[in-house]
Design a protein with these regions (language model features):
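Nucleotide/pyrophosphate-binding catalytic subdomain
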Residues: 1-266, 273, 277-279
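A glycine- and small/hydrophobic-rich beta-loop-beta segment
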Residues: 281-286
Length: 286
């Protein structure tokens, strides 16, 4: 069914106060491979790129932080390596960290940059290794070359944003000696949002949002607080791969990021629905 001119105008009018509110504000968006579940990769990526470009064109300052877990696992399988995870983090030996670098920096990052740049040369790919962006420390000897964020130097990101570009960040960090570490992209997104004093931190995933009862869609949490999320992690309601996302939301909001969101990246234009409509979508943490 076609949309009438009046309905189209109403959509634009509804977006106007949000365009004003978020003008010149940083929004960090974590784009993960799981956000592509249920849709063709090309279509999902093109729609995501359109959202990012529109956000930039109306005066927002988006930063994209990406994962690549499914792609890393796929290449590992082709090479005969078995992926192992503990609490949502990949166990990473020396060969695996090289595979992660190849996939994140050499495959996923250029794909995202190219998709955004279809609409104009505004995206620039960077790695956490560039300009000392992500300084890493080992997380746990049992995880191998899996790192935690020691500190973020946002200088290169601020320079790109000030020049009108959209940074697209691959989440490989290095320690003081230059050793590369694979860092969970959810964790990096939260740390970058804090370093840039972001207005919003957004996670795109393959679920509609957070639930109080895992198997009950009616228990979707529309709005929550860091304290409630702490309780849901403590009682096991939030577990597995969702833990890094939720921990990062909690830490970022407590550190001064105004809003954090968990959205279903399979929904077309979900970013625009969250940012520019009255109802919003998914789960908001504040």
């Amino acid at each position: 069914m076609s949309t009438s001119p009046g309905e189209k105008a109403a959509v634009l009018v509804e977006a106007l106060p949000y365009i004003r509110r978020y003008n010149d504000q940083v929004v960090v968006v974590k784009y993960g491979g799981n956000a592509l579940a249920g849709a063709s990769e090309d279509d999902a990526l093109a729609i995501f790129a359109e959202d990012i470009v529109l956000m930039r064109q109306v005066g927002m300052r988006p930063v994209v932080v990406h994962g690549g877990g499914p792609q890393i696992s796929s290449l590992m399988a082709r090479l005969g390596k078995v992926a192992e995870f503990r609490d949502g983090r990949r166990v990473t030996d020396a060969e695996t960290v090289d595979i992660a670098r190849m996939v994140l920096i050499g495959q996923v990052n250029p794909q995202l940059v190219a998709a955004i740049n279809v609409h104009g040369t505004i995206a620039v790919g960077v790695s956490g290794e560039d300009a000392g962006l992500i300084r890493a420390v080992p997380r746990d000897p049992d995880l191998g070359f899996v790192g935690d964020v020691d500190r973020i130097d946002p200088t290169i990101l601020r320079a790109l944003l000030d020049d009108g570009f959209v940074p697209v960040v691959a989440t490989i960090g290095t320690d003081e000696s230059g050793q590369a570490y694979n860092i969970n992209a959810d964790t990096v997104a939260g740390a970058i949002a804090e370093a840039l004093d972001a207005e919003k931190l957004v996670y795109l995933t393959d679920i509609e949002g957070l639930r109080r009862v895992v198997d009950d869609p009616a228990s979707l949490i529309r709005q929550t607080t860091p304290d409630e999320l702490d309780a849901l992690m403590a009682d096991g309601t939030i577990a597995g791969g969702m833990i890094p996302k939720v921990e990062s939301c909690v830490h970022a909001v407590r550190a001064g990021v105004r809003r954090a969101h968990v959205l279903d990246g399979r929904i077309p234009h979900v970013l625009l629905l969250e940012v520019f409509t009255d109802e919003g979508i998914g789960t908001m943490v504040l």
